[in-house]
Amino acid sequence: MHTGEYSELLIGINGHMKKITLKLKNNLEEDQYSNCVKYGWIEKRCGKNQSFSSWKRMWFILKDSKLTYYIKEKNLKKRSSTIGSTQEFFKQQHGIDNNNCTNSNSNNNNNNSDLIHLSAPSLSSSTSSTISPISSSSSLTTTTTTTTTTTNANTNNGLSDSINHVYLEGELGKKKEGKGWKVRWMKLLEHSLVYYKSSKDKEPLGIVNLNECQDCEVNKESSNKFVVVHSSNRYYFKTNTKQELTQWVKSVKSRIPSINQTKMDLDQFQLKGVIEFNSIQQIAETFKFNSQPNCLTITTDEKAYYLSFDSNKDKLDWLNQLNLTINKFKGGFNSGGGSNNSSPSSLQSQQAKESGNGGSLSPNILGNFKSSIKPWRFSSSPSQGRVSIGGGGDRSSTQVKFVDNPLSKSSNKEEFDGGEYGSQILPRKSTIIGPNGGVKVSTSGAVELSPVLISSNNNNNNTISSSGNSIPTCLSDLINESSDNEDGDDLKMMIPESLKNEMMRRSAISSLKNFKLEIFIWSNHQEVFTFLFSDSVLVDQVKAFAFKKIPSLANLSVLDYRLGIDEDTLLEVEFLKFIYSHTMVELALKTCGIVKIGIFHHRKDRRVKEKLYSDKFYGHLLSQSPDGRKGNGVGIGGNGIPIEYSRSEPNLQSCLSSSPSTRETMVPSSPSSHQLITPPPSLKQYEQQLSSSSSSSSQQLQLQLQQQEQEQLLQEQPEAEQSQPEPQPQLEPESEIEIEELEQPIEELLNISTTPISIRSNSILSSSTSASSSPSSTPSLTPVIERQQKMSAAGWHSVNPSVTLNQRRQLISGCPGWNIEVSNPTSTFTSQGFKPKFDKQEHGFYRRYNFDGTSTVQSFLGVDMKMGPLAFSLAKDANDNYRGVLHTKHGAKTISEDSKNIVGILNLLSLSKKVKTKKVVSHLIGLLDPSIDAKLLNLASNQSELQKELLSFEERQTTSGFKFGMVYCRHGQVTDDEIFSNKQGSPEWDEFLSLIGDKIELVGWPHYSAGLDVKFNSTGTHSLYTDYHGNEVMFHVSTMLPFSTTDYQQIERKRQVGNDICVVIFNDGTLSYMPNTITSQFNHVIILVQYDKQNNGYKVSMACKDGVKSPFEPLSPNNLIKKSDIKDFILTKLINGELASLQAPVFASKITRTRESLLNYYISQFL
């Protein structure tokens, strides 16, 4: 059985045994408060090893021989704040029966003098006459009043009618932690604090159970705020005056049991732990936790307990009581040679002198206890240990001899130095490969792990050692860790020594397990390497060894690559053991003992580019290893990482012998998208295979290839062209030509199915073959061969099959998540008579009819169940027409209606002005949206302020400033790093910029800046700007943004362009562009522009992300766009593209939430 299985077994056994022991101990004690000296709420630091710990509030009971602490039962359901549960809570807390409620006017009149109403108006005017101060908490609990109100026959249905104990009520500001301030009507009851929306409401919004509260205190001395600390939250309240604040704090405090030290009902608690007095070695004051200034440390034989108190007074009270109780239990305590009758204060001063740090006094040391009574131990061999006195790293320490418990971790005896968790971040230490396969993790406080456990004959206690050094074993550490429960209690379960020894022996044998790992590198010439690793190896060790031993990875950066099951599932957490790094890895190792892992770049966009442009990124992987190693080999098993490895390469003979159905090919799924699988071997491999064969067979094979190419070409040409010889164009040596897509006859001859690809080759056939060809092969030289020779003369080079070569004539190549706009073959674009149409809402309602005109605007607010918050404004213009605008979370709608038509339809002549306005509003809203009920709208208050808010709200939705990206791409650039590294563009690029806008200087620029720095030139000195039909447009030009000589990724340039919704790519080459080249969540529209030198015009194509409604005006034409027309086309396309993108789900949801929150704010303020 594996070591991990033993540890899980031990953890389960210890956990169950501990729970059973504590429950038995709790049940056997019929009265938990018997022999009780002191009890109260104390915060205890909990967590394994107390390194990643939290503070939990527990109920402590100090008895004459031990200190026990309890915690609330976890299976108790928390009370909800709903109305149903609120009623049940009132029935439980106050014994109320709704069916037996009685209404007594006499009780209300007689007891009205004892009821305290803290309403804001009454307090400000006559506070002294309405407030009757409460002298003490006892008077509040004993002098309760019965107050009921006269209600109708439906009294039994109202919850507020069931409240018969109200001690304090008034209007307060209320705020939950993490929420905003709200005005609520508060009522203080016997055991709860109830809050309503207003004083007239009968159903409460929620209840704060004071029995579950821990404290009530003034938040800040200079403010009128106080906080009620609940077990699950914090409630902040705000009063109008200091007198109200004092009254509320005093009254609430008197009803919190934890403050008044009322005995808690332990039926709702479970025993969490016990601290026996005979195991306590010292009690000290500690100041290592910044957030807990009043702390004590109780150090026992096995661990240290950290307790935090609410105040220094509580801490001193508990210290004195602990000292007296332990002194009484042990008949006097040791204080380092002091007298047993020393008081705590004298003992404190005496030990402060002995334990001063650098001559300074340490008044925190209060006692050091030692008893001859020791609990039962597993081992009889003594050991030395050091116990920290004072609980801090700067305290002096004294050695105390005690018998060690093998089930307790040594790290528990000394608390980590460095203060409270979260105050500092411990740096990750390097992992060192140890001898015999051992992995020593050099982390502070960690135990050295050894996957190969060797039994030592020199140790009688069957401990485990590695390389002669006695260190704790993996299993024993896991056993020790299993003994530390959530709060690290000192109750350890008893495991027989024989069972422990047997587990140690078996784990030493089973720890020699290993697993087989296949590492593949994605490329056209895919290689797979097989290694045998120990099961204790980490993910980063596997990756580092792969980069060290695989020759093709020698020149790559280890930090830029990750191991992964596939390109979408990477092993990002590299400090884990490899066998536990992912669920699929664990499953594969459990089922077959082998797993296949690839090496991928950590950036997703780079992985996509490596797939599509494998010839560029993986060209260096085609080289063979320096030592020519093939097949299986022996790794570096001596240092414990891999044991053996093997390497497999593609074999031509296996490709020839396999059937077409078994070979993986590249199959296109659609004209714009391709499903990429393992490609076939390249032509270079076939050339090497052909050259190694006999000369006669090589000549025969080449003749067959030439004949088959000629036949294929003749089949594709029309019959008219077959009768006439094809004209041969005159080519310049340095010119580039585009060739038609040709089939690869060599693949057909080898019975391998591929897609048509474009080939550029310096030498299609090997030189040795062409030189030794027979004379009979000379007349069979076809136009295909001649065309290949011309390509070689023109400088075309051989590349691996690539998807982009199939789409050379397309400006934009397809990729997942993007849609390419299909150009209209019959449409043309010209700027003559062109009037741009923008798909944006041009309202200007409030600016036109209220602030810039003389019309009277009335605004109405309301909430619809389906549409949410609504705002409708009505105005009557100079032409006696009614105009209205309806704002919802989905946008704004406007309407205009002639008043004569409305009067005739609604018969408004005999109606009053108020009724007439309601009918007009109802009529207009029915025309805008019939599903909205106009009766839900009410006339808002403070119309002038609301009109200003609605004007601002309208201007937010009306976009007048646009920012777009403008990027220059040279010929052959395929990655974003290359594109953003262009310091300057070509003359065609500069001409294109001058056609689109004006080059402006940023310093002191007074108009729309699009986030560019106009004061200090931190984002460049110049930019491109234009004002197009009232729309200010600023471009983020890639060559004008700051260039960094040290940052090869040009993060500043990517940040500016990556935040633009629409981007223009000026492609100064012939390669097609992929829309996902620049990785950004904001880029939704890509417009590619390519200059045609021969026709002196621009080719334009557009692609947009999924979710963007397309097409939008103007449509991309099939022909060229003239230079004089390019500005109108590009700017109109960009503006409409951004407006369409804002309707995409990723933007629309955010805009909808913003509108809804603003409308809700207007309703809360003006309705």
Curated annotation (Swiss-Prot):
GO terms for cellular component: cell cortex; cell leading edge; cell trailing edge; macropinocytic cup; macropinosome; plasma membrane; pseudopodium. Residues 950-1162 form the Rap-GAP domain. GO terms for biological process: cell motility; cell-cell adhesion; chemotaxis to cAMP; Rap protein signal transduction; regulation of Rap protein signal transduction; regulation of small GTPase mediated signal transduction; response to differentiation-inducing factor 1; sorocarp development. Residues 35-140, 165-257 form the PH domain. Residues 95-160, 335-361, 376-400, 645-734 are annotated as: Disordered. Residues 648-676 have a biased composition (Polar residues). Keywords: GTPase activation, Repeat. Residues 98-155, 340-351, 687-732 have a biased composition (Low complexity). It comes from the Eukaryota. PROSITE patterns: PH_DOMAIN, RAPGAP. GO terms for molecular function: GTPase activator activity; phosphatidylinositol-3,4,5-trisphosphate binding; phosphatidylinositol-3,4-bisphosphate binding. This is PH and Rap-GAP domain-containing protein DDB_G0271806.
